[in-house]
Amino acid sequence: MRGQLLPRTVPAWRSRADRFDDLVLDAVERLEARWARELDGVEFAVEDVPPSDPSPWEHGEVPLGRFFPADGALPPRIVVYRRPVETRAADSQDIGELAQSVVVEQVAHLLNLTPEEVDPRYNRDS
């Protein structure tokens, strides 16, 4: 038997990367409900892995996300790294929780607040 096993409209057809994008989007939308004005113009992105040149403050540990401040004409940007999050997560449910925590931590960095101020449901143990 050759051909598709599942039609493209079935949720199981979606790739892990697509599902991860959805998790990050859900996390961003949840924060935008509270911080809409502060997050206006901020770009959010998902990349598979971080660049090989770590920032000076990253000491040997692979980053799960990164905040890039506005630079000239470029708007501020928050990037979540899919593969490191998936690798660090204990299971598939943990991926969503960890992605949420990464987004909260990076937004906190952007707003110069603690993660708990950004999202009272933030869990440091994620």
Where do the protein language model's features map onto the residues?
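A metal-dependent hydrolase signature that marks the N-terminal structural subdomain at the beginning
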Residues: M1-A70, P76
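Hydrophobic alpha-helical membrane-association signature
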Residues: A27, A99-V103
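Active-site scaffold of zinc-dependent metalloenzymes
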Residues: E61-Q100, L110-S126
